[in-house]
Amino acid sequence: MEKYVCIHGHFYQPPRENPWLEEVEMEDSAYPYHDWNDKITQECYKQNAASRILGPNKKIIDIVNNYTKMSFDFGPTLLSWLEKHAPDIYASVIEADKISRESFSGHGAAIAQAYNHIIMPLANRRDKQTQVLWGIYDFEHRFGRKPEGMWLPETAVDLETLEVLAENQLKFTILAPHQANRYRQVGEKEWKNVDGSELDTTRPYLCALPSGQTISLFFYHSPTATEVANGRLLQNGESFAKKMCDIFTENNCPSQLAHIATDGETFGHHHRYTDMALAYCFHYIEFNNLARITVYGEYLEKFPPAYEVEIRENTSWSCNHGIERWRSNCGCHYGKYPSGAQQWRGPLREAMDWLRDELSGVYEKIMSQYVDNPWALRDRYIKLILDRNSVEDFLSNTVGQNLSYEEKVRILKLLEMQRHSLLMYTSCGWYFDDISGIEAIQIMQYACRAIQLANEVDGIDLESKFKGILERAPTNTREPANGREVYDSLIRPNRTDLNRVGAHFALSSLFTEYPDEIDVFCYSATTEVYDRVDAGIQILATGRATIRSNIVLEEHPIDFAVLHFGDHNLTGSVNARMADDAFANLRESLKRAFTKGDTTEVMRLMNVSFGGNNYSLWHLFKDEQRRILYELLETVWREIETSFRHVYEHNYMIMEMMRSMNIPLPKALSTPAEFILNQDLCQTIQNEQVNTGELRRLVDQARRLSLQLDEETLRFVSSKKINHLMAKLEKSPDDINLLESLDSFFSILFSIISNVDLQTSQNVFFMIGKKTYMEMKQRADSGKAPAKKWLELFNKLANYLGVAIH
């Protein structure tokens, strides 16, 4: 019997982009990273692209790309983010699929995923079709080939979903064993119920569909997958490998496939560093010839299904009640509110379904004026989503060449309205414990954007009825009390138009010198007039610009005036462009009042002239708001630092005496001391030339005073510094002075903090060793003193970095 092993990772993160900006904004809970995508990329996606295999002494003996060995799917919305924000990791994923084809008889490791992770059985046929087509096209665009299989979000399945997969030439999908209803050998009449007997997961099954089509199904081994998901199996790669091989059964089949499927984030994010267990699992199986590593496409070609199966419709892998987790108070929850309930799920689903149907009516009514089949146009819209620069070609090829500016904007708004009507069904919105959670807020933001676009193209008010349905969705919190209050307090204030983008541009121009043309998230600003007047700490700027949406092409010419009072108070007025002479007169009046120091008159003129369209620091988008706020507080920071440094330096001796007498430091002394020492440590580490003497002095002071170090921040800045130094070493691997600096730096650093992210530096060091070590050893063996010194230092660095030298 031939034995095969396949481990599938479902890699996905909920889309977190602000629907009006198309960017993920800063998420404080992900500190020290910018956002959760960034954090999980560092902990998981990056780790699996260069995973370590450890030898008996727990040192790195090899670095491998796990994606070349495992079967995997990546969410299209996640890949879009990775392509832009982590291009090296993105490239590793794409390259892994190419490499895997050489190992798996031409079959790639990657399979597709339904576009934005909706619960397919709860979608109408039209949305199912678009989800599958967008998932396929996104896959082809990125991986350069057609997908053989597709991952169904939450493995939620019904026959109609399988029909859509089969219609689009997809050969297989992966399900949990409890989603099988009954099976039989092909050609037999008798069915065997899965109830009461475990389904044999080591073989593929053929599922006959009502239309006459068929699709192959793989049912993963659930007990092993569960042990992997909860982390127990990932503490040791050898145990993991043996457990995978325990899946094989004693039967007369010519081959068996031991396979599991789990969230890809299990390997590194849910359980830190467990990517190494996965890497060692593959290594152990292959090294000991326990089985052959494969992917589903290869196995299916070699061993077509000899059994057929019927599924349990409306089931999933993550809800004991089928698919009720995404539409009712079924009892499945995450545990955040132990005495709470999820009665909000039903009204939220109802609100989205009602909105979808209303949006469909608007879309069909207007888009039918331009094309015969509006829904076929929506299916093709993915091509423009993936290449926003091709908008003119897309419109001329799909709609027509003689469109006016207004028609182009209207068509693009309709298509965007439909894109957001799909995004608002992202499954995470219902998965967790409350409608006030960030996942539910995210999908309601998509709904809000779709509502806004519908109003702009048709004048229809869908918001009132939508909020009325949400009002029936109770939260598990006292405030906000229901979905309507969540929407009004947490979603509606984020709604953005071109005027607000103009305000963001105008206000931020006080702190950043912009070129005449600048991108502002998914918009662009073209400045035609800009005047700035400084009077001490106060600033007045007036200007004229055109704000343009790079998504729907809409343009909005604006005039603006912004005033900074010198502290955290700044105000701006923005409105549609006024007559040239009126604007010129206003600028002169504002400038005259400002130079006289009459800010009251400046504000009166702004308010009257711009129709009360006033904006402040609160209207800036989050990242820029935070940056400007910190800039405004720079003087305050300096004053605090000066004060704390005075306390620290003038009381250092008494603090040292108190600690020598085992007297705890009072907060009034320890807080300033910790602030100053942590700041000085970070600054010393970040300096271009690390002064190891100063670093050692600061560490000694922290120890003598028993001060608390900010280890999380120190880890972050240290990792960046080590990566920088290692990049320099990569360019000059024989630089002994640099090796000595690294040795000194490591000896001090690792005496105060642990668990520094060394992955990038280990990768570089490992490659330097492979390229340079033997040459240096030969030189040292021939008596070259510099080479001997190089070997001594390189071996010390290898110990610090945990890399074995071959």
Task: Briefly describe each language-model feature range.
Residues 2-55, 76-77, 191-510, 534-536, ...:
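Active-site and substrate-binding clefts of carbohydrate-active enzymes
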Residues 4-9, 14-126, 130-131, 148-152, ...:
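Short, well-structured secondary-structure segments
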Residues 48, 64-65, 74, 82-86, ...:
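Extended, Lys/Arg-enriched charged tracts that mediate electrostatic binding to polyanionic substrates
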Residues 91-104, 108-109, 133, 145, ...:
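Acidic, His- and aromatic-enriched active-site or binding-groove loops in soluble protein domains
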Residues 123, 181-190, 227, 305:
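Short, charged, surface-exposed secondary-structure boundary motifs
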Residues 128-152, 245-259:
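CE4/NodB-like, metal-dependent polysaccharide N-deacetylase domain
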Residues 154-161, 180-184, 301-304:
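Beta-rich nucleic-acid/ligand-interaction surfaces
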Residues 651-806:
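Extended alpha-helical scaffold segments
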